[in-house]
Design a protein with these regions (language model features):
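A charged N-terminal "starter" segment
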Residues: 1-157, 172, 178, 194-215, ...
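Structured alpha-helical segments in the cores of large, soluble enzyme domains
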Residues: 48, 101, 114, 120, ...
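Short beta-strand segments
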Residues: 70, 157-163, 289-291, 328-330
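Active-site-proximal loop/turn and secondary-structure-junction residues that shape catalytic pockets
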Residues: 73-75, 96, 117-119, 138-140, ...
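Alpha-helix N-cap and loop-to-helix initiation/capping positions
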Residues: 118, 137-140, 178-187, 252, ...
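Acidic, His- and aromatic-enriched active-site or binding-groove loops in soluble protein domains
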Residues: 159-161, 179-193, 353
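Gly/Ser/Thr-enriched, mixed-charge loops and adjacent short helices
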Residues: 278-298
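C-terminal active-site-proximal or functional interface alpha/beta core segments in diverse enzymes
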Residues: 292-368
Length: 368
């Protein structure tokens, strides 16, 4: 009979009381392979990987989605082959993990390099192998990556890890006081009041049809005067005042949104993104990344963080006319460790997250 839901489906207790794994008793496996013995149910790994990839694609059905396996969970060449064949990318954060993934025959374009203390050798290997992303984790890292890329005569694809001030997981609830995390670059400047970002909870969604109508009206040839007026307003990229409201009456929500964008524009993340953009000859800015915790049971904290990431994306568009093509919303989706715990319902919670991301982008007038 099955042991409990937290065990792989192919694990059972037989009539004699022995644990069986795919029909083999624990005793026979120990006799053959010795102890300690680690068993990986590859059928379970592949099924879960495919489920996550499919759930993400279905939830974010108007966008291209990539799901990554965290190498720190467990990494071997066979596991790398299994998860990449199931459609996943692989996150690495040490030279050893990088070499294991490459030795498995996976091309660099399916690999990501993370880490807050990368060596020059790790950065060089990621650039040489054409990694999908090198995730920038600290303010001085773009210049290091740029220098190595110039030496190699190559262009590196980079993404900035942002500390958005949201933390969740385990027994902790959402907190907005985690700008001192050791990973990533803060969204807001030290001492800034994170309450300025609360305006995101007041944004009103607009229907895609209304958004399209507004865009059509702005760019329609028969509305030349309107086009000129709106273009001047929408192309106002002043760094200090990224959201110009001086020429028309605006709502309190719009004023609060302008204040939030100004706070982000003055923050460390935008400053580092500007450094990356200043090195576009050797650095391709592909997006921004956040990670808010581990063992998170529902989408609420992810939604909170995602809204801030969407506003960062809007702010960079306003200050530098650059739309981040990719936003990585991080991992930490819960799995049950004991019989009394629940795993996150991936299908339900990813749909909630996707709906929040899409509605926020529509409210901000940004593409998906």
């Amino acid at each position: 009979m099955p042991i409990s839901p937290i065990w792989p489906a192919a694990t059972a207790v037989n009539a004699e009381g022995s644990i069986e794994f795919h029909g083999r008793t624990a005793e026979s496996l120990l006799d053959e392979f010795g102890s300690p013995l680690y068993l990986i149910d590859t059928d379970e790994v592949v099924a879960r990987a495919r489920h996550f990839v499919r759930a993400a694609a279905e939830a974010f059905d108007t966008s291209t989605t990539h799901v990554s396996f965290a190498g720190k969970a467990f990494l071997s060449k066979e596991v790398v082959r299994l998860v990449t064949e199931a459609g996943m990318f692989v996150d690495t954060c040490t030279m050893g993990e990088m070499k294991i993934a490459l030795a498995a025959g996976v091309p660099g374009r399916r690999l990501v390099l993370h880490g807050n203390n990368k060596s020059d050798e790790e950065i060089a290997l990621a650039i040489e192998q054409g990694f999908a992303k090198i995730v920038i984790d600290e303010p001085d890292e773009p210049e290091r990556v740029a220098a190595i890329a110039r030496r190699l005569g190559k262009r590196a694809r980079v993404m900035l890890r942002v500390t958005v001030g949201v933390h969740a997981g385990g027994h902790e609830y959402i907190s907005t006081a985690h700008e001192d995390q050791k990973f990533g670059v803060p969204l807001l400047a030290a001492g800034a009041d994170a309450a300025v970002l609360d305006v995101l909870n007041a944004l009103k969604d607009v229907t895609p049809a209304a958004t399209n109508a507004r865009i059509s009206a702005t760019h329609s040839p028969e509305n030349g005067a309107e086009k000129t007026e709106k273009s001047e307003r929408e192309l106002h990229y002043d760094v200090k005042y990224p959201y110009d409201l001086s020429h028309e009456e605006v709502s309190d929500t719009d004023k609060a949104l302008a204040a939030a964008m100004e706070a982000i524009a003055d923050g460390p993340s935008i400053a580092v993104l500007k450094i990356i953009l200043a090195n576009q000859d050797v650095l391709e800015l592909v997006g921004a990344h956040s990670h808010i915790g581990s063992n998170i049971h529902d989408a609420e904290a992810f939604i909170h963080a995602a809204k801030r990431m969407m506003l960062l994306r809007k702010t960079l568009w306003a200050t530098d006319a650059y739309i981040l093509p990719e936003i990585d919303l991080g991992g930490g989706y819960s799995v049950a460790y004991t019989d009394g715990e629940d795993s996150m319902d991936i299908d339900v919670e990813l749909t909630r997250l996707a709906d929040a991301v899409n509605s926020t982008n529509r409210a901000l007038g940004m593409p998906a």
